[in-house]
Amino acid sequence: MGIELKKKCNYALVVPTSMGIRITPSNGQPVHCGGMAMMQVTSAETNVASVASYLGLPVKVLTTFVKGSPIAQLIKDNLRSRHMDYEGVEVPQGGPWGYRHQFNIADSGCGSRGPRVWNDRAGEVGRTLNVKDFDLDRIFGKEGVQIVHLSGLVGALSPETSKFCLELARAAKKYGTKISFDLNYRATFWKGREKELSAIFAEIASVADVLVGNEEDFQLCLGVKGPEAGGKGLKAKIEGFKEMIRRVKQAYPNASTYGTTLREVVDTNHHLWGAIMSAGNEWHVVEPRDITVLDRIGGGDGFVGGMLYAILKGWEPEKWVQFGWASGALATTMMSDYAQPADEDQIWSIWKGNARVQR
């Protein structure tokens, strides 16, 4: 059972996002030890979209920029290099204590020392994302979009971005665009807004066609009971994850596809990585397999991106979860936060466990 997509669209995938910068100490060193660091463009939503954009599908990013900022220029150049169109207003900085693109300061960890992430989001310009700044009738009607991917990160950033995501979902529904929703719960974003965000997330989930989250996301965003978050022995918990998805399906029956990833951390550079997907009445399970991890950030985004690419290509559902699993595994071998596949074969080679040199 596939997902019937709208035809004759300018864009296969559209993502709303707040673009920012990640600062990563070199050689897996901790932030507090100082030294050299790498600065790179990042956002969870463009991490998802990168699988499709690198493999040749048309992608558009809806965002906002700080006017005249060299960081904004870096972001625009990066999106172009990833083969993505973008649209967004230019917001005046308002002086040195005004708006900026957020910083995520994150080390990769190494071996027995886990990675640490420090979000520095004061004055984040992405929190001003507002539906009034975008012509949704043009984007979804005249231009046409096959799938819009919404993230709970953007949905919870501010009251404006919450409304923006809600209006995007409503416009998508109006024009026949399929909706993908990755819940992406963050406790710090929800603090003080629990009642408001629960209602908004429930409405988006009720119209979503693809619904993705981990055990914590489903429990804390949608109130659906699931297994204990994280821990060891994930393979033995697969039936518990399935039961959670059954409860999600019962509460939010509009979706045809539900997915969750499975991750057990042996150490920072050695994970067991798996996935569960329900499409229609069929289950597709990738039992946790060993993967080597260079940097874990973006692995879950890679899974969603690979799954959406497979849906957009019209493949059978079994391949959706396989390609998603392998795209997530590919992302963890890169320092960029997002998968940059050379071609489909590179991802399928990871699925097949073939790391032999290609000449």
Where are the regions that the model predicts?
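Positively charged, low-complexity intrinsically disordered leader regions
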Residues: 1-31
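Alpha-helix C-terminal capping segments
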Residues: 40, 47-60, 81, 310-313
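Hydrophobic beta-strand scaffold residues
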Residues: 59, 86, 179-181, 212
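Conserved N-terminal subdomain of the carbohydrate kinase-like
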Residues: 59-152, 347-359
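Charged helix-capping and loop-helix junction motifs
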Residues: 134, 162-167, 193-202
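Conserved post-catalytic alpha-helical subdomain immediately downstream of the catalytic base
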Residues: 268, 283-353
